[in-house]
């Protein structure tokens, strides 16, 4: 059993009171997990904000099947072992459904526990194909996949920047290497070869040696597979060293913390992300509610909201919170109305439509191109 063989340490776990005290029989426990602490905590906050607002809105309308939702927040710090601990804690607490995790390197090992313990999981952010390709009954996403995102990036580089000298940099994480390799695959298939493929160490503060190698190689376009903190530092240090290049990256750059790190050097950096859900008519009322609270529902906030929303819709239609029956309903039913618009699932648990587009950083904000 995974609960006996995998690491089960003390993981930071906060229980969020989503409803006034009520008998346990009148409650349904759900969870959301992500990096609430550590270098990716800004993304954990996005997941927490989305889940909390969804629970509040659902409870205000009577809950699910007449029962109020109680939300637990788990902190995995984007660490695989801690993610397993969080998953086991959710199982011990009787959680039926989890909106999470953020990092693919957390979602994938946690999913093994959820599969064994009979918990349905919908990630709003983990894009590595392996998460759903392994064929578990309980794994779903509201986001797209690296191969979908990499196809857009690879095709763009090969067709619109075919004369550039390209470097692909990646941080050797499940997410970063995954998206870099998918981009490389599609770029190569379109006839464009990279001049450099290089791994870098995440968590460092000095990337000047890496920048020097880029300059020496005459690189004038860099594609990053990794997270916003390191990418922001590399872009900033590249500007300080006088490297003139175009910078492209993945969906990890859709956080204002990127600009806080890069400063003006982030001007013109481009990244792939689905069409901004904040602008969708289906999200207007929820976006307005977030703004009243002083929250900008950027990045994965609405994707997490939608994860809770689509689970609640399927449970209501199935007339049960039994995870296997809800999972079957998600795949056979739909389309499901959410803040992201209508969502439908294929047999793997992937959304049938994930339209990635380009965004660009300008003057401290990112905009769809």
Feature-to-residue mapping (PLM):
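Extracytosolic ligand-binding ectodomains
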Residues: 1-9, 20, 25-369
């Amino acid at each position: 059993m995974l609960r006996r063989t995998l690491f089960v340490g003390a993981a930071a776990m906060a229980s969020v009171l989503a409803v006034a005290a009520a008998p346990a029989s009148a409650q349904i426990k759900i969870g959301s997990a992500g990096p609430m602490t550590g270098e990716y905590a800004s993304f954990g906050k996005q997941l927490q904000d989305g889940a909390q607002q969804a629970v509040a809105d659902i409870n205000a309308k009577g809950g699910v099947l007449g029962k109020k939702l109680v939300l637990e927040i788990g902190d995995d710090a984007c660490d695989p072992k801690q993610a397993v601990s969080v998953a086991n804690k959710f199982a011990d607490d009787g959680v039926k459904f989890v909106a999470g995790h953020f990092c693919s390197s957390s979602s994938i090992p946690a999913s093994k526990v959820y599969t064994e313990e009979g918990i349905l999981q919908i990630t709003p952010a983990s894009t590595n194909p392996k998460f759903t390709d392994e064929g578990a009954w309980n794994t779903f996403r509201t986001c797209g996949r690296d191969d979908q995102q990499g196809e857009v990036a690879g095709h763009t580089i090969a067709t619109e920047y075919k004369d550039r000298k390209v470097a692909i940099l990646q941080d050797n994480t499940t997410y970063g290497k995954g998206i870099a390799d998918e981009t490389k695959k599609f770029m190569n298939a379109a006839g464009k070869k990279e001049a450099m493929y290089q791994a870098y160490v995440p968590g460092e503060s000095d990337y000047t040696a890496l920048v020097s190698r880029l300059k020496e190689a005459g690189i004038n376009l860099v594609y990053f597979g990794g997270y916003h903190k390191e990418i922001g530092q590399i872009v900033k240090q590249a500007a300080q060293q006088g490297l003139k290049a175009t910078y492209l990256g993945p969906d990890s750059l859709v956080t204002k913390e990127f600009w806080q790190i890069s400063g003006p050097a982030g001007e013109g950096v481009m990244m792939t992300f689905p069409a901004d859900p904040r602008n969708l008519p289906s999200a207007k009322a929820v976006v307005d509610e977030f703004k009243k609270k002083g929250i900008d529902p950027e990045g994965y906030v609405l994707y997490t909201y939608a994860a809770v929303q689509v689970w609640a819709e399927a449970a209501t239609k199935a007339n049960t919170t039994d995870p296997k029956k809800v999972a079957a309903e998600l795949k056979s039913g739909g389309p499901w109305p959410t803040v992201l618009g209508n969502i439908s699932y294929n047999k793997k648990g992937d959304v049938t439509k994930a339209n990635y587009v380009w965004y660009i950083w300008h003057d401290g904000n990112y905009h769809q191109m």
